[in-house]
């Protein structure tokens, strides 16, 4: 019993020992007076740590949010009863929160202890909110006591501003939800790299703002007015725009109008470049890609459209596509890291719990085993009870016979039941049943899709019947499944639960409709949810299944993100209500829908700003509400900018980050599954017939041969699944032309890669493709001279270049055509040229067909898909030449198809070909995602049809609701001015985007998913009322949920997954080529850098005067001075503004001259210091030089340009442009600042590197734009330019440049759907074009839908994501662990090496290596705190080859640094891994010269002396000294110096010396002075770093300095192991004393002047007794620490 008791006790003790959550540590004293035992403090602690208390507080916060949301803001501080009640309730909340703060402060202390109340971020937030609340209440009371009016505008404004703080309370919910904290943490962690990017963006904005200020200042203040009035002259639907009275800008075309100044400017004078602040806001607005085209068009109107586009397009490319995508790169990196952490934390937690359980189990087992020992005592009682039971059984024997019959029947029934269940289970699991269900679902889908507006009654009846039949079938399916699988296992599956939910709601719906309780509409939406069943298909489609699994996975992580997003929206909506509630009512009578007047409306507005659609319009309203473009008004834009940055850039990019993260996991999942399946198959085959394994190996090869579709590498053609599993299967990704069609064109090995390496690396020596054996055209045999000649011509590089040139020329001629007048002179010339081009291309194809044959045999011309493309393009040209009359529409189509000519270049430029092939692979892989997205789109479209069909009609007069009422005329205020009324006819119109049938619904939804124009559609839907009826204002605001759910699901989530997929695919494709080379991406980049880098030349002048200048120019003070001056210059530029006084202008001119003078002086100083060659060697200096020249010209021009000189208007205009052009040079000085900051410099370096990765991607984009622009010109070129529509003077397809600009606008998503509508059929034709009478409205075509949607999808999803993929690849270093070496660290090595090797000879003394590496910070160098001994050990492991003159080379040193830091082939047999590494380098970088390779990795058998061996001997020597010293201390005597004995010296002997008699003679190698110099250099390095005292010189002990004569240095001869002469070897066991050599050469003069001065001083110091004392004490101090090492 004792044992048992003790075991139980042990168990309970263990339980006690392990509390689940440790309580937060409490300080011993709070508020200086309350100890832990104080009863009041105990009470506070108990309350604060009581669970329900936390719940109560969270509920209070929630209630507070609700109260804030109910509050109705009103204009002019009006109020109503609800609001006054809420004011009172606010006091209660404040009271609760104050008490909570007080209790916590008492419990945990206020601020002084480590875990005090204010040491926690959330508590600081709480405390601020509470104290501000209390403060505002006090202020109110004081103002009441003083008898002031109720807190209104004047006194109460500060109170209201303080009130806005309450809005932050919902943030406290975050501290309650752990999953929120992962998302928040990753965002907070990302803040540091994000700040770098923010700086870069800010810098861009400043530069562009100042450029804008210089170029466009004051240009936006003229517009067209009617003569002698203040009324602006505009066309219908057009905002007033700037104009110019002279030059290239817009002229006033309306009769009776003139161009006059004093117009405030666009957007009520908010959008312009008149001063620095407004310019920055305008530039920022352009970077967000919202409304940038409007700004561009206004500038065009003001100054002409020749060059402003350069400014805006470059801004969008750099700002939006590049820099803002960096944000994405950073966030996804951080998110991945954060999730990894959370994962490992979870794993650790699980482990701990597992251990705890094991411990418990052990306790119980002990308990039980102890108990079993006592068990025998109990046995008798058991036997006795059994006897009793036996007795009772005999009594009931008679009753059993009656029951037996029943049991037999029951058993029979159970048998049948079991059989039936088994049969039905087999049925349910069979493929037949599965496909049956799928067919029923598809039928269901078709029936739902047929529904549309104005459908015939018969169709409606048919749909109802079909619905009921299908419902019955689905109910049967459910019942059968439940019967077959049983309740429990049926409801285990998520799909089944969903199914039963849908069926039950369907039944409910039928009952409700039949009993007329509710209208059929409400629940018919649920019918659409049945469509989700389509996802059942995924059961047998593995890759799709994994995709859906990964989507559901990301839904989990995205749920917490959505919660965060929602919190964020609530806070900003409440804040918006406090600031703008009831203020958006202006005099112009226009109804604004995006307001902050009620809470739901505010939420929608905030959501709209998050998606970035028309957020600028809301911001302009906000600014106008606070008094327009004044100081107070403009401060409002801070709210919108913060909302936009945090919401759009940060939170929405986290969506993408999560998507990319989870997709990568799904890919791994798929490939892992594939690998397992293959393994299983292989084992099966092996078991079935062992002899077949050989054939099995050939299976893959055959599979690859079978793959059809020429020209695309086999990898691209393997099925999607196999492509995904490629990672785990070993296949040869680029079989040498082993499949039909390509073997006539044997390609050099260029791997598929979205980021092709520079062509230099890909040896593009084209091999001539052999002729096929068969005869061509049945005439020419392979030996036929004509055919051989054709073959030779085709394969000549000059011929290929010639054809490329003509492809280029023909493309230019296509772009030069005039789309409006087909019969113009220009077009006639071009058509003659066209004939020439067609003849040349036809000749080329005939030659090729002659050489290779047409298509009958393997390897002939038409067996290659790219050749077929060539042939079809040329064929189209030939046919269109044959049919001349342009009236036939076929010819028009054929003429359009000539546009595909540039595609022929793909077959000629290999790099481009591979980008295209990579795109194909990506498109194939994306198939699954497209499928899922289309299904969801379709489902939402069906729901949309149910909700909105026929409800988007409206009358121009909003008071009329039906089509019958909408007749006649009504009055409208012109330009929102009630004084000018005009009569307008009423028109009954239909919205352009609507949900009348499923297709138009999908179109509308597609535009919503691109975030363009969705608020208009949303408010249309909110106002929708009934079929064929007009809108009623805010009729059902809850409909917004449909749009918001759709946007979150499709636009945020699916589209981002789509983007993520493209990125992941490209990255995988990029890695594909390297998958066998054992180096990861980072290692490859670093090795490549180490192989390609060359040392920098550092010029140090010999001339003493020049040296002085050089010394000044290179000093850091000079740098800082220039930095300061550039900043001053920036400020002076930024202070200029429109309408400045003459004195101010004069001052700024003087300053400009002064700065130009200063920078010119700087240039001359640098030229003097570096001489021309040295100066122009640095790109930054070249940049400086250009800027100085430009600035000087600018100064001269502005001096010449005096206002007194009369000139013709045109001349004035052109001189203006030249002057403003030179003004740019002032601004470009700013860019010099970029060369200073370390982080920004790294960013820039990577930036330029990613540009290098883009050339082919860029080429592809150019081709895409070219083709679409030419098609656009041919198809939409004739549409008339009408101001007020979307095809107008600024955006049209009439010239090639205009068409490209318009397409660029569409690619950025600026109202592309409006342009689509403006190009669709039935538009007015241009008066100059060739339409027939009565055909004025026949321009435009329905082809516009296909054209714009395909262009948008290609651009937005594929092409721009190529940018993102490249950026994410190159910028991963921003979020990577900085302790991992990356290529961005290696620049520092080049810079510091230059100080030791100013002539850039590529060699330095090996002694300098230690000091060099200690000056470079880790991870590349050792850092200045690295002890010398550790540094030497690292050098031993680096082991660079040492030249005979004692120097090491640049590349070898850098390479070995990279190699040791990244652990590339450092394990195992050294020589073997060296060989392997040589092979890898040869494989990846084929052009590496053997000389360089031997330098960085010496080949086997190369008896080279290396730095490693050299330093190893030194370490041995040092350990030996220590060993000797310990012996002395142990035996208590100091051995006498024996004349024959000398300490061991580092170095290698020649064979002759080893075999010589007793006396060894030693020579000195190359350039090195005796060992003294080595020791001295080491001591010098230590003194330089101020570490001498701590580490005791280089190796701790400096015995050699003060024992005996100076020791000699070794020669470097062979690589034999160290052997010593036998003399004196008996003295000690392990280390051996050597005879002291007689001969010793005098030390040479040190050539390095720097060293020699120091060494002189050192020599003196080393002889002082002082030094020896320090030395001895250090030796003692050091001995203990190294005992362990010595014993090793």
Swiss-Prot record:
Keywords: Calcium, Calcium channel, Calcium transport, Disulfide bond, Glycoprotein, Ion channel, Ion transport, Membrane, Metal-binding, Phosphoprotein, Repeat, Transmembrane, Transmembrane helix, Transport, Voltage-gated channel
Identification of the protein by name: Voltage-dependent L-type calcium channel subunit alpha-1S
Residue ranges of coiled coil: none
Entry comment, domain topic: Each of the four internal repeats contains five hydrophobic transmembrane segments (S1, S2, S3, S5, S6) and one positively charged transmembrane segment (S4). S4 segments probably represent the voltage-sensor and are characterized by a series of positively charged amino acids at every third position.
Molecular function GO labels: high voltage-gated calcium channel activity; metal ion binding; voltage-gated calcium channel activity
Annotated stretches, region: Dihydropyridine binding: 986-1075, 1324-1390
Subunit structure: Multisubunit complex consisting of alpha-1, alpha-2, beta and delta subunits in a 1:1:1:1 ratio. The channel activity is directed by the pore-forming and voltage-sensitive alpha-1 subunit. In many cases, this subunit is sufficient to generate voltage-sensitive calcium channel activity. The auxiliary subunits beta and alpha-2/delta linked by a disulfide bridge regulate the channel activity. An additional gamma subunit is present only in skeletal muscle L-type channel.
Region (Disordered): 1-24, 672-696, 729-755, 1635-1664, 1669-1688
Region of interest (Phenylalkylamine binding), residue spans: 1336-1379
Keyword Disulfide bond annotated: yes
II repeat segments: 417-663
Chain positions recorded as Ca(2+) binding sites: 290, 613, 1012
Residue spans, topological domain Cytoplasmic: 1-51, 109-120, 178-196, 333-431, 486-493, 542-560, 661-797, 853-864, 910-928, 1064-1116, 1171-1178, 1238-1256, 1369-1688
Acidic residues bias: start-end ranges: 740-749
Job of this protein: Voltage-sensitive calcium channels (VSCC) mediate the entry of calcium ions into excitable cells and are also involved in a variety of calcium-dependent processes, including muscle contraction, gene expression, cell motility, cell division and cell death. The isoform alpha-1S gives rise to L-type calcium currents. Long-lasting (L-type) calcium channels belong to the 'high-voltage activated' (HVA) group. They are blocked by dihydropyridines (DHP), phenylalkylamines, and by benzothiazepines.
Start-end of Polar residues biased regions: 1678-1688
Pfam families noted in UniProt: Ca_chan_IQ (PF08763), GPHH (PF16905), Ion_trans (PF00520)
Recorded family membership: Belongs to the calcium channel alpha-1 subunit (TC 1.A.1.11) family.
InterPro entries: GPHH_dom, Ion_trans_dom, VDCC_a1su_IQ, VDCC_alpha-1_subunit, VDCC_L_a1ssu, VDCC_L_a1su, VDCCAlpha1, Volt_channel_dom_sf
III repeat residues: 784-1066
Gene3D superfamilies xrefs: 1.10.287.70, 6.10.250.2180, 6.10.250.2500, Voltage-gated potassium channels. Chain C (1.20.120.350)
Keyword flag Repeat: yes
């Amino acid at each position: 019993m004792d044992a048992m008791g003790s075991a139980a006790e042990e168990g309970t003790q263990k339980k006690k020992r392990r509390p689940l959550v440790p309580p937060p540590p409490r300080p011993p004293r709070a508020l200086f007076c309350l100890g832990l035992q104080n009863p009041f403090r105990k009470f506070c602690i108990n309350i604060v740590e009581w669970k329900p208390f936390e719940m109560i507080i969270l509920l209070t916060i929630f209630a507070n949010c609700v109260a804030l949301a109910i509050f109705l803001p009103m204009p002019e501080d009006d109020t109503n009863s609800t609001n006054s009640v809420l004011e009172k309730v606010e006091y209660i909340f404040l009271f609760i929160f104050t008490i909570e703060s007080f209790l916590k402060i008492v419990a945990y202390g206020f601020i002084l202890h480590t875990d005090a109340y204010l040491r926690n971020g959330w508590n600081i937030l709480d405390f601020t909110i509470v104290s501000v609340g209390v403060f505002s209440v006090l202020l109110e009371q004081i103002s009441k006591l003083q008898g002031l009016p109720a807190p209104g505008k004047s006194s109460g404004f500060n109170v209201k501003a303080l009130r806005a703080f309450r809005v932050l309370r919902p943030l406290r919910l975050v501290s309650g939800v752990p999953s929120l904290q992962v998302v928040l943490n990753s965002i907070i962690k990302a803040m540091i790299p994000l700040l770098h990017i923010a700086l870069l963006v800010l810098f861009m904005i400043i530069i562009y703002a100042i450029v804008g200020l210089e170029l466009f200042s004051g240009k936006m203040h003229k517009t067209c007015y009617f003569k002698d009035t203040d009324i602006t002259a505009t066309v219908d639907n057009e905002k007033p725009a700037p104009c110019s009275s002279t030059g290239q800008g817009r002229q006033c075309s309306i009769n009776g109008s003139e161009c006059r100044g004093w117009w405030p400017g666009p957007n009520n004078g908010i959008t312009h470049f008149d001063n620095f602040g407004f310019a920055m806001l305008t530039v920022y607005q352009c970077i967000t890609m919202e409304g940038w085209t409007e700004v561009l068009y206004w500038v065009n109107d003001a100054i002409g459209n020749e060059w402003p586009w350069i400014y805006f397009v470059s801004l969008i490319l750099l700002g939006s596509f590049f820099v803002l995508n960096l944000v994405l790169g950073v966030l996804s990196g951080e998110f991945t890291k954060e999730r990894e952490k959370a994962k490992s934390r979870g794993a650790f937690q699980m482990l701990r719990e597992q251990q705890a359980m094991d411990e418990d189990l052990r306790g119980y087992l002990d308990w039980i085993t102890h108990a079993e020992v006592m068990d025998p005592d109990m046995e008798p009682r058991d036997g006795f009870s059994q006897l009793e039971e036996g007795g009772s059984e005999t009594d009931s024997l008679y009753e059993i016979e009656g029951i037996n019959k029943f049991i037999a029947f029951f058993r029979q029934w159970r048998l049948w039941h079991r059989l039936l269940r088994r049969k039905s289970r087999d049925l349910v699991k069979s493929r037949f049943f599965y496909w049956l269900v799928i067919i029923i679902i598809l039928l269901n889908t078709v029936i739902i899709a047929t529904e549309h507006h104005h459908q015939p009654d018969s169709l409606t009846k048919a749909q109802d019947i079909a619905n009921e039949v299908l419902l019955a079938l689905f109910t049967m399916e459910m019942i059968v499944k439940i019967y077959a699988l049983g309740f429990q296992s049926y409801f285990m599956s998520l799909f089944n639960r969903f199914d039963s939910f849908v069926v039950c709601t369907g039944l409910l719906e039928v009952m409700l409709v039949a009993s007329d309780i509710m209208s059929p509409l409400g629940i018919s939406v649920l019918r659409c949810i049945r469509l989700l069943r389509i996802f059942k298909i995924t059961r047998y489609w593995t890759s799709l299944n994994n995709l859906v699994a990964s989507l559901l996975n990301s839904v989990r992580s995205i749920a917490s993100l959505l919660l965060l997003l929602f919190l964020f929206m609530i806070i900003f909506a409440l804040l918006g209500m406090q600031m703008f509630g009831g203020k958006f009512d202006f005099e112009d009578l226009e109804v604004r829908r995006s307001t902050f007047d009620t809470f739901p409306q505010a939420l929608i507005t905030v959501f709209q700003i998050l998606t970035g659609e028309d957020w600028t319009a809301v911001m302009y309203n906000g600014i106008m509400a606070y008094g327009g473009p004044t100081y107070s008004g403009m401060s409002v834009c801070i709210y919108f900018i913060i909302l936009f940055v945090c919401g759009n850039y940060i939170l929405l990019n986290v969506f993408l980050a999560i998507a990319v993260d989870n997709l990568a996991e799904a890919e791994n999942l798929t490939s892992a599954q594939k690998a397992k399946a293959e393994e299983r198959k292989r084992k099966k085959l092996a078991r079935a017939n062992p002899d077949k394994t050989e054939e099995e190996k050939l299976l893959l090869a055959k599979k690859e041969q079978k793959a059809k579709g020429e020209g695309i590498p086999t990898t691209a053609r393997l099925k999607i699944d196999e492509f995904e599993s490629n990672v785990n299967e070993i296949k040869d990704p680029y079989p040498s032309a082993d499949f039909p069609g390509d073997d006539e064109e044997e390609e050099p090995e260029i791997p598929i890669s979205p980021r092709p390496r520079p062509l230099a690396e890909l040896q593009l020596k084209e091999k001539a493709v052999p002729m096929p054996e068969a005869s061509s055209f049945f005439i020419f045999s392979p030996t036929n001279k004509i055919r051989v000649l054709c073959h030779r011509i085709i394969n000549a590089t000059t011929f290929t270049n010639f054809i490329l040139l003509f492809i280029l020329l023909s493309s230019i001629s296509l772009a030069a055509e005039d789309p409006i007048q087909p019969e113009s002179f220009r077009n006639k010339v071009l058509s003659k040229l066209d004939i020439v081009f067609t003849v040349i291309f036809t000749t080329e194809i005939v030659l090729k067909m002659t050489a290779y044959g047409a298509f009958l045999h393997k390897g002939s011309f038409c067996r290659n898909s790219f050749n077929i493309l060539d042939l079809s393009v040329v064929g189209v040209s030939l046919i269109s030449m044959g049919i001349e009359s342009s009236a036939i529409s076929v010819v028009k189509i054929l003429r359009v198809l000539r546009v595909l000519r540039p595609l022929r270049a793909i077959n000629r430029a290999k790099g481009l070909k591979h980008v295209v092939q990579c795109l194909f692979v990506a498109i194939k892989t994306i198939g699954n995602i497209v499928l899922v997205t289309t299904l969801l789109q379709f489902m939402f479209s069906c729901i949309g049809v149910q909700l909105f069909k026929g409800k988007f009609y409206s009358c121009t007069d909003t008071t009329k609701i039906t089509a019958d009422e909408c007749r006649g005329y009504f009055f409208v205020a012109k330009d929102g001015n009630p004084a000018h009324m005009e009569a307008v006819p009423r028109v009954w119109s239909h919205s352009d985007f609507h949900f009348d049938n499923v297709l138009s619904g999908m179109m509308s939804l597609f535009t919503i998913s691109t975030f363009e124009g969705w608020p208009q559609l949303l408010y249309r839907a909110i106002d929708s009322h009934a079929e064929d009826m007009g809108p009623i204002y805010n009729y059902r605001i809850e409909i917004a949920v449909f749009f918001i759910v759709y946007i979150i699901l499709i636009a945020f989530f699916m589209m981002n997954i789509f983007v993520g997929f493209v990125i992941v695919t490209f990255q995988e494709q990029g890695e594909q080529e390297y998958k066998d080379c054992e180096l990861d991406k980072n290692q490859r980049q670093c090795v490549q850098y180490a192989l390609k880098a060359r040392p920098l030349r550092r010029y140090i002048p010999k001339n003493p005067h020049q040296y002085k200048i050089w010394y000044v120019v290179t000093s850091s003070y000079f740098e800082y001075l220039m930095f300061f001056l550039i900043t001053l210059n920036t400020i002076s530029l930024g202070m200029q503004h429109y309408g400045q006084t003459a004195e101010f202008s004069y001052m700024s001119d003087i300053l400009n001259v002064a700065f130009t003078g200063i920078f010119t002086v700087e240039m001359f100083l640098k030229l003097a210091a570096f001489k021309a060659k040295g100066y122009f060697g640095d790109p930054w200096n070249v940049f400086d030089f250009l800027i100085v020249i430009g600035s000087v010209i600018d100064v001269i021009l502005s001096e010449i340009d005096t206002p007194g000189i009369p000139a013709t208007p045109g001349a004035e205009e052109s001189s203006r442009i030249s002057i403003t052009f030179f003004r740019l040079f002032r601004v470009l000085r700013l860019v010099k600042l970029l060369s200073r900051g370390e982080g920004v410099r790294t960013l820039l370096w990577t930036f330029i590197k990613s540009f290098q990765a883009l050339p082919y991607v860029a080429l592809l984009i150019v081709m895409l734009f070219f083709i679409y622009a030419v098609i656009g010109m041919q198809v939409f070129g004739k549409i008339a330019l009408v101001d007020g529509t979307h095809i107008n003077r600024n955006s049209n397809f009439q010239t090639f440049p205009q068409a490209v600009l318009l397409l660029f606008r569409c690619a950025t998503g600026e109202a592309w759907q409006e342009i689509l509508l403006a190009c669709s059929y039935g538009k007015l034709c241009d008066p100059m074009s060739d339409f027939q009478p009565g055909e004025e409205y026949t321009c435009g075509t329905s082809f516009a839908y296909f054209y714009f949607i395909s262009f948008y999808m290609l651009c937005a999803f594929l092409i721009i994501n190529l940018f993102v993929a490249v950026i994410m690849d190159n910028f991963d270093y921003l979020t990577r662990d900085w302790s991992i070496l990356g290529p961005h660290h290696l620049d520092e090595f080049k810079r510091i090496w230059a100080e030791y090797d100013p002539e850039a000879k590529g060699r330095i003394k090996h002694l300098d290596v230690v000091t060099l590496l200690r000056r470079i910070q880790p991870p590349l160098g050792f850092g200045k705190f690295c002890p010398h001994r550790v540094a030497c050990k690292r050098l031993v492991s680096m082991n660079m080859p040492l030249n005979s003159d004692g120097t090491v080379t640049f590349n070898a040193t850098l390479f070995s640094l990279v190699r040791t830091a990244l652990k590339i082939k450092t394990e195992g047999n050294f020589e073997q891994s060296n060989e392997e590494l040589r092979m890898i380098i040869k494989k990846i970088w084929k052009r590496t010269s053997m000389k360089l390779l031997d330098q960085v990795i010496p080949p086997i058998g190369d008896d080279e002396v290396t730095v490693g061996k050299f330093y190893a001997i030194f370490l041995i020597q040092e350990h030996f000294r220590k060993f000797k010293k310990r012996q002395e201390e142990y035996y208590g005597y100091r051995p006498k110096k024996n004349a024959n004995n000398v300490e061991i010296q580092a170095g290698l002997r020649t064979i002759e010396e080893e075999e010589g008699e007793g006396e060894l003679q030693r020579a000195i190698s190359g350039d090195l002075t005796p060992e003294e110099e080595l020791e001295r250099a080491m001591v010098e390095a230590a003194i330089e770093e101020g570490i001498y005292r701590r580490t005791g010189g280089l190796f701790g002990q400096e015995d050699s300095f003060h024992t005996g004569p100076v020791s000699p240095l070794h020669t470097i001869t062979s690589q034999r192991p160290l052997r010593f002469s036998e003399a004196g070897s008996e003295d000690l066991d392990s280390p051996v004393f050597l005879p002291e050599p007689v001969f010793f050469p005098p030390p040479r003069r040190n050539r390095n002047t720097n060293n020699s001065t120091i060494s002189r001083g050192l020599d003196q110091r080393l002889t002082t007794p002082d030094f020896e004392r320090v030395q001895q004490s250090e030796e003692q101090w050091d001995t203990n620490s190294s005992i362990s090492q010595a014993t090793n």
